[in-house]
Structure formats: C-alpha cells, structure tokens
Amino acid sequence: MALLNVLIYPDERLKTVAEPVSVFDEELQTFIDNMFETMYHEEGIGLAATQVNVHKRIITIDIEGTKENQIVLINPEILESFGETGIEEGCLSLPGLRGFVPRKETVKVKAQNRQGEDFMLDADGLLAICIQHEIDHLNGIVFADHLSPLKRQRMKEKLLKLQKQIAKNR
C-alpha cells in the first residue's frame, strides 16, 4: 500500500466534480486500500478520491478509526435526508481549521461497494455528517464553501501562510 498526497485548499483541483466509477478491477481495489491507508495516516475519519486528485466518485469512511467498520461508498447518492444538525467540521484538505456547517441529521444513501454491488445505507449522527461532507467533495465543494465569504478568506490566508512555512522548512 502507498500513501497518497492530499490536496490542500484552496487548490483548484478540489473544485473538480468527480466522475462515476464503472470499472471495478484490481487497480480500484488497490486505490481504495491506499485511500484507507492515507486516511488513517492523516488521522481522518473520511476521505473522498477528489482529495487525492483522483476525480472518481469514491469515498472511504471509518468513524471509529478501528479498521473494523470500514465503509466504502462508490457512486454514492443521497436519496432521502431528514432533520437538522451540524458540528464544527474539520477536513484533511483544510488542516488545522474547523467551521460549523449545517447538515441533515439522517440520510439514506444508495451506493456500490468495492465489488460494484448496489446497496443502501441508512446513517445518522456523525456518520451522516461525514457522508454529506465527503459527497460534497465529490461535487467539488469543500466545507469552507458553506461558510461566510469573510471566514472563507481567513481560512485561505491561514492555509497559504502554513504552506509557505512548510515550503520554507524543506
């Protein structure tokens, strides 16, 4: 397995809308494994393929981080959503930054698994929030896009400053 490079906001590639997956081969399986490895290495609970510059509709999730309840959603689609909730969200593409995003409390999702088989998933709480967050990525949206223009600009400035510091220390 290999670690993948996570794109950092405001990288324009994060705005790319992902294409559906149609081939479920060994290359896809390896890529999904690499997504999980990257997600765990970065201490995330979810990762969208768009975040690693692969613009396919693939999401990996492990809310507990135990590797025992891994969820793979390929070509996910929210069919129903109910209730109102929200938390201070973080994102591997916006390291160290958080922002409150209103979300639906419960979602019903249609997706495909690693083998291309269709399934339905009913999710609530943190899992529902994570699914919505990751599907946003597949649609070219980062959580900062849900914030006010002023907060979004401050986030960009902080991340650009951080990137300059990292580049300087190399």
UniProtKB/Swiss-Prot annotation:
Its cofactor is Fe(2+). InterPro entries: Peptide_deformylase, Peptide_deformylase_sf. Binds 1 Fe(2+) ion. The keyword Kinase does not apply. Fe cation binds at C91, H133, H137. One of its GO terms (biological process) is co-translational protein modification. The active site is at E134. Keywords: Hydrolase, Iron, Metal-binding, Protein biosynthesis. Its EC number is 3.5.1.88. The lineage of its organism: Bacteria, Pseudomonadati, Pseudomonadota, Gammaproteobacteria, Pasteurellales. This is Peptide deformylase. NCBIfam families: pept_deformyl (TIGR00079), PRK00150.1-3 (NF001159). One of its GO terms (molecular function) is peptide deformylase activity. Removes the formyl group from the N-terminal Met of newly synthesized proteins. Requires at least a dipeptide for an efficient rate of reaction. N-terminal L-methionine is a prerequisite for activity but the enzyme has broad specificity at other positions. It comes from the Bacteria. Belongs to the polypeptide deformylase family. The keyword Magnesium does not apply. It is an enzyme of class 3 (hydrolase). It catalyses: N-terminal N-formyl-L-methionyl-[peptide] + H2O = N-terminal L-methionyl-[peptide] + formate.
